[in-house]
Curated annotation (Swiss-Prot):
Any one Gene Ontology cellular component term annotated for this protein: bacterial-type flagellum basal body
Biological-process GO terms, alphabetical: bacterial-type flagellum-dependent cell motility; regulation of bacterial-type flagellum-dependent cell motility by regulation of motor speed
Protein keywords: Bacterial flagellum, c-di-GMP, Nucleotide-binding
Gene: ycgR
One Pfam assignment: PilZ
Protein name, per record: Flagellar brake protein YcgR
Taxonomy of the source species: Bacteria, Pseudomonadati, Pseudomonadota, Gammaproteobacteria, Lysobacterales
Length: 265
């Protein structure tokens, strides 16, 4: 299933929005104090939250406005688009993505309630029971060079949920996954879906065929100043030798950067 940037498709999401990739349960927080603290950090850092609306294939940029510690609820900003606000109001749940200091955050809000705050629309929901906070500090993530970047091709046929053939720039990569950028007008990818027919092309290496699972998706400003989306994807099942190839690429680029900084090259 594809998720267009235009907000209007009414097809049902057919995935379990709370599904975590294998081994990710250790990053699931259930302590209310910790959850409130992270949501408050989203407010303090004015972080953009990308909200996926259940029952509609749409992604709406928003922000956390308030966290109530007494009644355990959270308030999120509404959209300037009336149709989007109606869809949010009617949703059974909202699946929200954000980043704090380059660490992915994901949480689910049940049955949002519409509020009118002055002239602005907002939505209140009960504090999430759990929050996914992916602190994979042990996995070094390399920001790829703007020139001679790796590319990732993501394909899907109609039988698997919709025709898709995207060749995207890889903006960062680690031994556990990669991130690609989607420009305005490109279809968004389905959260938590595994795309089986993908190809990673590293410079000076043979193409690597592999499946990729969508872990996060949020709005960002691209290097050219336009708005787009950053999509974080996990390596689901690397073929033999691929991990070593990726690690060699990361080491080589990192070594070249350090050499330039020290004036060696």
């Amino acid at each position: 299933m594809l998720v267009p940037m235009s907000e209007g498709d009414t097809s049902e999401l057919d995935h379990d929005a709370d599904h975590l990739a294998e081994g990710d349960e250790r990053y699931l927080l259930r302590n209310k104090r910790q959850i409130r603290g992270l949501l408050q950090q989203l407010i303090d850092q004015r972080a953009v939250v990308t909200m996926h609306v259940a029952g509609r294939d749409m992604a709406v940029p928003t922000a956390v406005l308030e966290v109530d510690e007494d009644d355990d609820y959270v308030i999120l900003d509404g959209s300037h688009n009336d149709a989007s606000n109606r869809a949010i109001e009617q949703a059974k749940y909202l699946l929200c993505y954000a980043q704090l200091e380059r660490v992915n955050i994901r949480f689910r809000l049940e049955t949002p309630e519409r509020l009118e705050r002055d002239i602005h629309v907002a939505f209140r929901a009960t504090l999430p029971d759990s929050l996914y906070h992916l602190q994979r500090r042990e996995s070094y993530r390399l920001e790829t060079p703007i020139t001679d970047s790796p590319t990732c091709t993501i394909r899907q046929d109609a039988a698997s949920g919709g025709n898709l053939n995207l060749q995207l720039r890889v903006i960062d990569i680690s031994s556990g996954g990669l991130a690609v950028s989607l420009a305005t007008g490109m279809p968004l990818l389905e959260p938590q879906h595994t795309y089986r027919d993908c190809t990673l092309q590293l410079p000076d290496s043979a193409p690597i065929a592999l499946p990729l699972t969508v872990c996060s998706q949020y709005k960002m400003t691209l290097p050219n100043g336009s708005e787009g989306f950053r999509v974080g994807m996990q390596f689901s099942d690397l073929p033999r030798g691929a991990d070593e190839t990726i690690q060699r690429y990361i080491f080589r680029v990192d070594r070249q950067r350090n050499a330039r900084k020290s004036g060696v090259f």
